[in-house]
From Swiss-Prot:
NCBIfam families named in the record: termin_org_P1
Signal peptide as annotated in the record: 1-59
Keyword Transmembrane helix included in the entry's annotation: yes
InterPro entries (alphabetical): Adhesin_P1, Adhesin_P1_C, P1_N
Protein name in UniProt: Adhesin P1
Biased composition (Pro residues): 1604-1627
Record region (Disordered): 219-238, 252-355, 898-953, 1274-1362, 1589-1627
Residue spans of biased composition, Low complexity class: 261-276, 1341-1352
Family according to the record: Belongs to the adhesin P1 family.
Induction line: Expressed at high levels in all growth phases in vitro (at protein level).
């Protein structure tokens, strides 16, 4: 069985196994990739040498004195040497050198940057260490001792590379090498498009040793001292800050947290003092400042203040004459008397803090002082393995050049000078960001806080916004800059995107142990040209980038950017935790702040606002901290109501903005709710002012869990230290999703408008500010509350997915908008005269009340959510803590509906809601309201009067019973998940997509309505959550779980359908019953597969496998294929949705099995040899008794008394589904069953036989035969004699493009012949009329004018072409993948297109696809979907994995394959290669070409991607896309390669035939020398795959002898061989 044939590597064949250690999540990964021999370095090239040569080549390349270390400023970490570092690099340094200390004789060295850098260079060795897959160190790169050469390039500009000889070297050293070689490497990032190319971040040694240079950063209010200037702080210059209490003239001012004057502490020797205090320090809370207007002061612009703490800064004054205040230098701290600094030789004299280097100093000597990006080429197994291409410097002025003008020019606030004394505090307020409180960002440090140099015209008494300095005197200005400390806080987190390298900043600071305030202020970008020979460096402040995230839906807030006003007077900074690709989007995460240490007391804040008008658009005076708002109100303004935005007519620019962030607001809020918000302002300010209050429509884009700074539910106070000091607590996580394409393409220079203001229109502002023009629906960046892997575009809000969610009818299985909570099937229960189930499990009538409920997303709101969250509960100011929800409205269902039990009399039909009632077609009871109005039922409308709750019919409900949920599981509370669940009911809410997926996990909490009366009321004791408690009686398992969202099944996974039976040969449709279920194969085929994971273990990763074809996009969701037709033209007013079963043949596509919870039997999906996705259904195990009963067609009692464990607990099983086990019951008799567990048993097979009570309207709507008949009638085809089109039998109808509307299609009588009564009256489909267009199927050709002339979508039976993959879409209802596509808008298809795509509503713009070599296929498909591998045999399907591909009909799908090259069960890794069949004849491949290995070869398809999804924050996890990292699900390997080849098949492969051929010749002997972890598996692969059977022609051209010790160097075509150079010895 094991073949041992040995074959040597041929000349024209070489193999590289890139040994790269995988991430912590995936373990070790073996990756194989094969390319042609060529002389230039392409993206796809790897080299490979035998592992036993590695030791020889790298002998003595390791310096044993160097040990790993970690640079704390970035996310780079030197992981343990166990193969876990995914970049195969680590930072190492010599720790034998002693730390830098400053004695009395070395003070000039210590404080002179140049001498300091020179002294540090001689002290310690820093290097990079390369590792192989097994964690073995290969060699060190010590740049200080390296004499590198730049690589040579060919005529196309590509790096010259030979897999064995290595890089061609030019003999020239890189430019400025001598200036940068002594810098410290602190981070490495691998280019995703080139496995040999790395970006190395180098920083000066002063950065690494900053804290040891005795230059601690001390700021005002950092800590309290006793006022004496004699205490020491060990080796650290702790710049002292005097206690504000020491100023007797300022007795009212306190630093919260300072116990007394004598409570100050000093840090221990050698210990650094952090803001907020280290151990032993007293934490300094925010400074309180009180302002109060005199009661008799007139509102004349010059107000008199009764109390004005703002008039005095928290520092001591030496003199006070008039309005001129002189600050003394000793207010800023004292240096140690034993260590004077340059410029001040007087021991003990005060020394204002200055940065280590100013911005201009860094700029003038970039090679020495800036951070440098070094482009390193490194191929571990080549002879010339290392080359350094170029060095680029991150100029701080590239960032400051794009600062807003308000940051570069000191000025007063735009709103004028209100209080002359306040000028003392607002010293040179540069964008509300002054050097006194934030000296790190000012070149002069604390020295510029001296208001002698304000440069302001103090004689200007007009109080206008002409507060700029009189002369452009740079000496007097203090613009926000980027000096040394703040600059290096901005270095870190290297991220490649295309030819752009983005530097987002670090999560710490060079002064981290002393101070945590300096953070990243923006992002640097190094953009290389196509060949990498030149680069440009630019930077954008986060203030600019994040201001692009605005609310587009509300007119009142259009001009308010995120976290800024129109003049960019706020300076957001960010501690970047990491940047990574999630899917195709770039997610930036960290903490963001605009923190300051001064706050304004809550009670006096409103006085300050209304009387002094000192507030600029929501940011109070000195309020530099970021006022983030949560779903529960302002994070730091809990006193403010969350309901309105007030804009006074008299002060339109000055009033604060208040945000109503109730998630349930719609575009048209209810007027009485608006009135409720306005009333407090009316009472206080009068109606004239209140008329300018507008509701804010929550857009769902940001400020959910991201900004939950203060937890109002637990009454946890907002931490002043947290807000002000940029703490790293996880609840401050900030996540922004950036569009990397636009980010990489932004211009180098930002253009601002007049006076730095925004344009009047937000889109004009975009063009003016960024000089780019994104389309209306694609803001170039947006927030996401969760790091979602499921996204349909740059802006999830308003995306196509959201449109689908608006359309999809959410399905309940009985009891208006909810479940029959007792789990009683009315077929097995007696019927009352009203048609209601009595709850007794016996059958007398055989009817069923399980009627699906169709509605729009807004159903399920039992209470008035708008009034609930926006009413009186939100208007409390200063009273008791605001409750989250009104007690009267706790009957909310979390996005689904509620249960309305029987009326007390038992005769009413209150609880049995027919489809006509749910859709508003008739009236029920005594109320006739709008369609689908939840309040139309009397007992559902609960009002509150005092403490009593009353239903509309007057029956009082005990408050405690009605509202108290006593049986909730311990991990759920009534409010814990309500924000998420409530947003599920909203239109245009980004979280709805997440809940769409979370429904599959069953993780959304379910709250049960307590309404009703008497014994029929749902009791608290009935709220059973534990399956084990009720496993004997499933009728009591009343709360749905595991995929059921409050009784609403996910429409993408299930269908509501009617099984139909022709009874008695009458040809009439006499019996029908609705059901919900999945499709399974109806034929007796063996759907055998290995269960990889339980079908219930859904994760967002299961939603994916995106396939784009023309104007159609599809993705797989479980066992279903969801297709959006006309995906790229959503503006046309229609949207198609098609659900196709993946596991049934076309002929049996409509076969359904009905069950309340069909997913319980789903066991996973797989791919057969034809590439079809098939599913495994464990129907025998779960519903065997019910299936047996139905198949026997007689009254039978279930034989299985012991139910299996809950489906989620079922372990891995292998099941064979045989259709013969589910023979439908065709008897016309009544079936009686005492089914005691309807939740775990099959209700009915496809064909059921009895139903005496049914809503005919719903039946007619859902009957597929009748729908098809109506469709044929609508399109003028013969509906009586013409046979059914094959396509109508096999596909779900698609909402298409024809004129008309949905209601007109389905109106009129049914065509079944047996329907009667209301069945002929049509159905009002107003709830689903949001999507216009005909309900059209895939119809055959017709000459009717309403359809195109070619609609023949029947499967092609002539060519024998199998339907392959999940993306097999018919070409006629979607544009073929040709060169031109009209009307493209920016969607994920932008990855395929040249240019911006269609951006206007008028006129199509022809857009061409990119050439195949430019298309990054893997960036289109980022979601693993299906399990492919049999864990027993390791390899499946002749060692070739069928692809999920969507290819034109002209291409034989058998001509593309994915070959398994290696598999390792120990490390759970896989090596794959994509291959394309090239026949011998030079013809374009098509279906007529026979795929015969004897007539052609499978060649590697070299269309590697340029960019790939990243999976970890580690900068080394920048995998090339052609290196396929695996997502491991222990204990089974799970991988999917989702590739669309429709655009790539057209490559003239025959032209590159010789260049693409790759053969394999591996002997068992050579495999045996691999590491123990992979060797045996490789051997098994070779034996099973026959890799050793290399193509004969390749063997013939091989000149190597078998068993050659080393493969020879392949010759260069058309060029003489270069001399073979011996491997260089490490320096």
């Amino acid at each position: 069985m094991h073949q041992t044939k040995k074959t040597a590597l041929s000349k024209s064949t070489w193999i590289l196994i890139l040994t790269a250690t995988a991430s912590l999540a995936t373990g070790l990964t073996v990756v194989g990739h094969f390319t042609s021999t060529t002389t230039t370095l392409k993206r796809q090239q790897f080299s490979y040498t035998r592992p036993d040569e590695v030791a020889l080549r790298h002998t003595n390349a390791i310096n044993p004195r160097l040990t790993p270390w970690t640079y704390r400023n970035t996310s780079f970490s030197s992981l343990p040497l166990t193969g876990e570092n995914p970049g195969a690099w680590a930072l190492v340094r010599d720790n034998s050198a002693k730390g830098i200390t400053a004695g009395s004789g070395s003070q000039q060295t210590t404080y002179d940057p140049t001498r300091t850098e020179a002294a540090l260079t001689a002290s310690t060795t820093f290097a990079l260490r390369r590792y192989d897959l097994a964690g073995r160190a290969l060699y060190d790169l010590d740049f200080s001792k390296l004499n590198p050469q730049t690589p040579t390039r060919d005529q196309t500009g590509q790096i010259t590379f030979n897999p064995f000889g290595g890089f061609g070297l030019s003999g020239a050293a890189p430019q400025q090498w001598n200036e940068v070689k002594n810098k410290v490497p602190v981070e490495v990032a691998q280019d995703p498009s080139n496995p040999y190319r790395f970006a190395v971040l180098l920083v000066p040694r002063s950065v690494v040793y900053y804290e040891q240079l005795q230059r601690g950063l001390g700021l005002p209010q950092q800590r309290t001292e006793s006022g004496q200037n004699t205490s020491t702080t060990g080796a650290m210059f702790g710049l002292k800050v005097k206690n504000a209490e020491a100023d007797t003239a300022k007795s009212n001012e306190k630093l919260q947290g300072a116990e007394a004057t004598g409570s100050s502490t000093t840090s221990g020797s050698g210990q650094s003092t952090q803001r907020g205090g280290s151990s032993g320090d007293t934490k300094v809370k925010a400074l309180k400042i009180e302002v109060k207007k005199k009661s008799d002061s007139e509102d004349n612009g010059q107000l008199q203040l009764e109390k004005n703490d703002l008039a005095n800064a928290p520092i001591k004054r030496s003199e006070e004459s008039g309005q001129s205040v002189q600050l003394k230098a000793d207010d800023f701290g004292t240096a140690l008397s034993s260590s004077g600094s340059g410029g001040n030789s007087n021991p003990g004299s005060p020394t204002p803090w200055r940065p280590w280097l100013a911005t201009e100093q860094i700029h003038k000597d970039l090679p020495k002082w800036s951070a440098s990006i070094l482009i390193l080429y490194d191929a571990p197994y080549a002879r010339n393995r290392t080359a350094i291409d170029r060095v680029d410097h991150l100029d701080p002025k590239a960032m400051t050049a794009n600062y807003p003008p308000s940051w570069r020019t000191p000025k007063w606030n735009h709103h004028g000078l209100w209080d002359w004394k306040a000028r003392d505090v607002l010293l040179q307020t540069t964008g509300f960001f002054n050097p006194r409180r934030h000296p790190e960002w000012f070149d002069g440090g604390q020295t510029v806080a001296d208001n002698e140099k304000t440069g302001f015209d103090v004689d200007n008494s007009e109080n206008t916004k002409q507060g700029f300095q009189k002369e452009a005197d740079s000496d007097k200005s203090a613009p926000i800059a980027l000096p040394f400390e703040a600059y290096f806080a901005n270095i870190g987190n290297l991220t490649w995107f295309g030819q752009a390298l983005l530097v987002f900043g670090g999560n710490g600071h060079v002064t981290k142990s002393a101070h945590t305030a300096p953070l990243s202020i923006g992002v640097f970008r190094v953009r290389y040209n196509a060949t990498g020979t030149s680069a440009t460096v630019t930077g954008w402040p986060y203030a600019l980038l994040f201001s692009g995230m605005v609310n587009k839906q509300t007119d009142g807030l259009k001009d308010l950017p995120f976290n800024n006003n129109r003049w960019f007077e706020y300076v957001p900074r960010m501690a970047v935790a990491g940047a990574k690709f999630v899917g195709r989007e770039l997610v930036l995460a960290g903490t963001i702040t605009m923190g300051d240490t001064a706050t304004v007391p809550r009670l006096l804040y409103d006085e300050l606002e209304s009387n002094l008008n000192l507030v600029a658009q929501g940011q109070g005076l000195l309020r530099e901290d970021l006022q983030l708002f949560t779903p529960y109100g302002w994070a730091n303004r809990p006193d403010l109501p969350i309901g309105a935005w007030s804009s006074s007519s008299s002060s339109s620019h000055n009033a604060p903005y208040y945000f109503h962030n109730n998630p349930d607001w719609q575009d048209r809020p209810i007027q009485n709710v608006v009135d409720a918000f306005i009333k407090p302002w009316e009472d206080k300010n009068g109606k004239d002012d209140a008329k300018y209050i507008y509701p804010y429509r929550y857009s769902g884009m940001w400020a959910w869990q991201v900004y939950n700074w203060s937890n109002k539910l637990t009454d946890q106070p907002l931490s002043a230290d947290f807000v002000n000091e940029n703490a790293y607590q996880p609840n401050s996580l900030f996540a922004a999703i950036l569009n990397p394409e636009l980010l990489a393409a932004l211009p180098d220079k930002v253009k601002y408008g007049k006076e730095n203001e925004f344009a009047a229109n937000e889109y004009e502002r975009f063009n003016q500010k960024l000089t780019v023009a994104p389309t209306q629906g694609t803001n170039w960046s947006h927030f996401s509350p969760t790091l979602s892997r499921f996204s349909t575009g740059f802006n999830l809000v308003g995306s196509v997915l959201d449109q689908v969610l608006d359309y999809v009818p959410w399905i309940g299985n009985g009891y208006r908008y909810g479940n029959n909570h007792r789990g009683v099937d009315d077929i097995t229960a007696p019927q009352t005269s009203a048609g209601s189930s009595s709850g007794i499990s016996t059958n007398t009538s055989g009817s069923r009340s399980f009627l699906p409920t169709f509605s729009n997303i807004g159903v399920g709101l039992k209470a008035n959510v708008q009034a609930t969250l926006g009413g009186s509960q939100t208007m409390i100011t200063g009273g008791s803590p605001r409750r989250t929800l009104d007690q009267a409205n706790l009957q909310l269902w979390t996005g689904a509906g509620w249960r309305n039990d029987k009326a007390s009399s038992g005769q009413s039909d209150e609880n049995h809601t027919k489809f006509t009632s749910a859709t508003g077609m008739d009236q029920q009871g005594q109320s006739g309201t709008s369609a689908g109005n939840p309040d139309s039922l009397k007992q559902d409308n609960i009002s509150k009067s005092g403490d009593s709750l009353t239903t509309q019919d007057g029956n009082a409900i005990d408050q405690q019973e009605a509202t108290n949920y006593t049986n909730l599981p311990p991990n759920l509370t009534p409010t814990a998940d309500w924000p998420n669940a409530l947003s599920f009911t909203n239109k245009n809410n980004a979280q709805r997509a997440q809940l769409f997926l979370r429904g599959l996990l069953g993780s959304i909490p379910v709250l049960v309505n307590r309404s009703g009366s008497d014994s029929n009321k749902f009791q608290a004791t009935d709220q059973k959550w534990s399956y084990t408690d009720l496993h004997s009686d499933q009728t009591k398992l009343n709360l749905p779980a595991y995929g059921e969202v409050n009784g609403l099944l996910n429409p993408a996974l299930v269908e509501t359908y009617f099984g139909n039976t022709r009874a008695g040969g009458s040809g009439s449709n006499t019996t029908s019953s609705p059901g919900i279920g999945f499709k399974i194969p109806e034929q007796n085929n063996d759907s055998k597969a290995t269960l990889i994971t339980p079908g219930l273990a859904w994760t967002p990763q299961d939603v994916g496998n995106l396939v784009v074809s023309g104007t159609t996009v599809s993705f797989q969701l479980g066992g279903w294929l969801v297709t959006f037709t006309d995906f790229v033209k959503p503006r046309a007013g229609y949207l198609g949705l098609q659900l196709t079963g993946l596991d049934a043949s076309d002929a049996t596509q409509r076969a359904l099995i009905w069950a309340p919870r069909p997913w319980a039997a789903f066991r996973g999906s797989w791919v057969n040899r034809l590439g079809r996705v098939e599913s495994v259904w464990d129907l025998k195990g779960v519903w065997a008794d019910q299936a047996q009963s139905d198949s026997q067609g007689s009254t039978t009692t279930a034989t299985r008394n012991a139910l299996p464990e809950h489906p989620n607990a079922l372990a891995f099983q292998v099941s064979v589904v045989e259709a013969s086990a589910y023979k439908p019951n065709t008897s016309s008799g009544q079936t009686q069953s005492t089914n005691s567990s309807p939740y775990l048993h099959l209700v009915k097979p496809k064909k059921v036989t009895q139903s005496d009570k049914l809503d005919d309207d719903l039946k007619n709507l859902l009957d597929p035969n009748q729908v098809r008949t109506k469709l044929r009638q609508s399109f003028g085809t013969d509906h009586s004699t013409q046979p059914q089109p094959q396509s109508l039998k096999t596909t779900t109808p698609v909402f298409g493009t024809s004129s008309g509307n949905l209601s007109s299609v389905l109106s009129g009588g049914g065509a079944g012949g047996g329907s009667s009564g209301s069945g002929q009256s049509g159905v009002d489909l107003s709830p689903v009329e949001k999507v216009s267009g005909w309900l059209v199927g895939q119809l055959p050709s017709t000459s009717d004018g309403n359809t195109s002339s070619t609609n023949n979508l029947a499967p092609n039976t002539n060519t024998g072409n199998d339907v392959v993959g999940v993306g097999r879409l018919s070409e006629s209802n979607a544009a073929k993948m040709n060169d031109d596509v009209d009307g493209i808008v920016r969607t994920p298809l932008a990855e395929l297109l040249d240019g911006e795509g269609q951006t206007a509503d008028t006129g199509p713009q022809s857009v061409k696809f990119k050439s195949p070599d430019q298309i990054d296929f893997n960036r289109l498909f980022t979601h693993p979907v299906t399990d492919l591998f049999d864990p027993v045999t390791m390899l499946v399907y002749d060692q070739y994995i069928p692809l999920f591909i969507d290819i034109p009909a002209s291409v034989n799908p058998k001509m593309v394959r994915l070959k398994v090259l290696s598999f390792d069960t120990n490390e759970q890794s896989l090596g794959l290669r994509l291959e394309f069949f090239k026949p011998d004849q030079d013809t374009q491949p098509n279906n007529n070409v026979q795929v015969n290995p004897n007539n052609g070869d499978f060649l590697p398809l070299l269309t590697a991607s340029s960019q790939g999804p990243q999976t970890l924050f580690s900068p080394f996890n920048q995998w090339p896309d052609y290196v396929l990292p695996l997502a491991i699900t222990v204990p089974i390997v799970v991988i999917v390669l989702s590739v669309t080849l429709g655009l790539a098949i057209g490559i003239p492969m025959h032209k590159n035939k010789q260049a693409l051929k790759a053969g394999f010749a591996l002997s068992n002997q050579k495999v045996d020398v691999l590491t123990k972890a992979v060797g045996s598996v490789f051997k098994e692969i070779i034996n099973r795959t026959g890799i050793s059977q290399a193509p004969k022609r390749l063997k013939q051209t091989s000149a190597a002898k078998p068993g050659a010790p080393r493969p020879p160097v392949p010759p260069k075509p058309g060029a003489p061989k270069p001399p073979v150079q011996p491997p260089k010895k490490p320096a």
